[in-house]
Amino acid sequence: MPDRYVEYSQNDYDNIMKLDTLFISQLDSKYKVEYHKLPSLISGEVLKRCGYFSTMPNQLSKVDIIDVSQLESLGNNRELEEIKYSSSENYFLTPAACLHFYPMLEHKEVKECIYSSLVDVFRYENGNFTMGTRQWEFTVREFLAIGNPKFVEEFLEDLKEKFLTIALRFDSTAKIQNACDNFYPTNLNKVKQKFQKYNNLKFELIVHILEKEVSVASFNYHNNHFSKEFNFDSNDTIVTGCVGLGIDRWISLIKESEKDYKL
């Protein structure tokens, strides 16, 4: 189905590259930034340690391969009458851009730094897809801040202000608002959502696309949730926080604004 993913034109591609360059340029020289190329595949073990199977299992996409035993029956036929799949490999498509960074940091002595990557991300969204704003596959520019609480909190506040300023170029109603993750609705997860909102752990940059409110960026304070699990907080001083910018939604915003894209 075409709303699961998007093929972009040359003009769209040019705008994506300009947009990503603009996002990266918002990081002041005071930040130590490492840029990484991250894969689309992720281990189920990493997802388990991150808590994904309990919080958002409905968003996950399992990677399967065709059952090789079927191929013997292919014979001279052009194709298999019925395709069966084997799911023995414990791999999934990456559901969140920052998740690969945590095992990379395991047992490292980490000081104040930023990890960043442009990542293809996959979320099933319960099958509720909309072209340009809610797809199965989409692209995210991710910034992960690692350091003491003051460093991470100030980084998140810095980027909130800067990305809101950019969004206001295309939508005069753009705003930052308190939010929570769309966890699978168990009783425990409902408590986690309330905890997130009450403690201001998540904010979103909201714009209007096709007359609907859409988040084009999220700002997340993790505390020591990941630094403890992945053993890079040996002195109880290291926390993390991330900023994710949904490239596809930004492109939809720019198109709707009917304004020439200028860096």
Regions picked out by a protein language model, each given a short descriptive name:
Residues 1-263:
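TRNA-recognition modules of translation machinery and tRNA-sensing kinases, especially anticodon-binding
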